[in-house]
Amino acid sequence: MRPIIAILIALFILLQYQLWFAAGGIVSVHHLNENINHQIMENQKLKDRNTALLADIDDLKHGAEAIEEHARNDLGMIKKNEVFYQIVK
């Protein structure tokens, strides 16, 4: 009777090890779920960024105000008879 119990205990330990630590076990599934959640958040950030960039592109295509704002802020252009003061901190 004792050898059968020892074999069953060894088999139980082996199965538990495979369940928890082997490839496809609970630990690896947990790590995969964390990676999936991280990737979902990263994808959402990129979607938001793309949406903002598409809105900027649309403004530049159809709005003169956006073009003027871009020229003033990014390129440092000014209108005729206008004085530009740049304050350096």
Swiss-Prot record:
GO terms for cellular component: cell division site; cell septum; plasma membrane. It is found in: Cell inner membrane. Disulfide bonds: none annotated. The keyword Transmembrane applies. The chain crosses the membrane at residues 4-21. Residues 22-89 are periplasmic. Pfam families: DivIC. Residues 29-62 form a coiled coil. Residues 1-3 are cytoplasmic. Its main location: membrane. It is a single-pass type II membrane protein. Keywords: Cell cycle, Cell division, Cell inner membrane, Cell membrane, Coiled coil, Membrane, Transmembrane, Transmembrane helix. One of its GO terms (biological process) is FtsZ-dependent cytokinesis. PANTHER family: CELL DIVISION PROTEIN FTSB. Essential cell division protein. May link together the upstream cell division proteins, which are predominantly cytoplasmic, with the downstream cell division proteins, which are predominantly periplasmic. Belongs to the FtsB family. Part of a complex composed of FtsB, FtsL and FtsQ. HAMAP family: FtsB (MF_00599). This is Cell division protein FtsB. It comes from Coxiella burnetii (strain RSA 493 / Nine Mile phase I).
